[in-house]
Amino acid sequence: MLDRIKESSGSVLGFRFDGKLSESDYATILIPDLERAMGDHQNVRILLKIESFRSWRPGEGWDAFKQWPGLERVDRIAVVGGERWREWMNHLPGLFVGFAGIDVRYFPENRLRDAWGWLREGLLVPPQPA
């Protein structure tokens, strides 16, 4: 299952992966949300928070995402998850092949706030009402 994280705002979108990720998650949630953000912003940044993640086959959905024309407007991806995901990212470089020009970084679960901060770094943030 994939859902959008409420802390998402502007050009920084977060998604929580929980359980099993399906190809329809790409088509009905991930891509439409990113395309909406791109309507208002030149580039977008993505946080992928992995929780209780049980299974995933990259398959057609992942391949379609890697070939998605809007991917050229993604400049940062933060992957937040357990130690197992850090190991996967180190041993499966092919997972992110096709992400040329995108800065992809791993953050442990206890550094979620740092991941959001890194994604928002350098962006103009409108002043908050007092």
Regions found by a protein language model. Name each.
Residues 2-130:
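Amphipathic, Lys/Arg-enriched alpha-helical "gate/interface" segment within cytosolic domains
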